[in-house]
Amino acid sequence: MFYSKKFKTFKNINHCFFSRKGGFSKGIYNSLNCGLSSEDSKTNVLNNLNLVSKKMNISSKKLMLMYQTHSSKVIVINKKNKNLKKFQSDAIITKMKGYALAVVTADCVPIIFYDIKNKIIGCAHAGWKGALNGIIENTLNEFKKLNANNRIYASVGPCIGKRSYEVNLDFY
């Protein structure tokens, strides 16, 4: 588990970035695969999600997941939609206490957001396509719709590096 030094100083938020190690999955999904849409055994994925929930000290019923589509779509989780548990988007945010927001990445960039004054949390899956199409800007705009101020903190998690990621020239 990895932590943001800055986020560790905030009293009202618990956060971490998990590595791929320490779970139940085997083979190409070894070992902490939390991707419900993967072809991994659903039992392994659910066991991994339960492990994450325990480490975060919350009920697995309070772990909010996304079906990530490399889009720029952001969903605000509220009392009306909280029971969906899995949202088709690449960012989720909420003001509700007692919930954990999750983003699953391999190469893409996980980002955690926090408005310390208004107690708004969010997380985003920023792949190159979503980043180019505004996932970060859209996430911040949704924060502002919830009356966030300009003191939104962000922590960027582990992701693929430039030396390990090839793109065609037309990408630039």
Q: Residues of each region from the PLM?
A:
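Active-site microenvironment for binding and transforming phosphate-containing groups
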Residues: 1-172
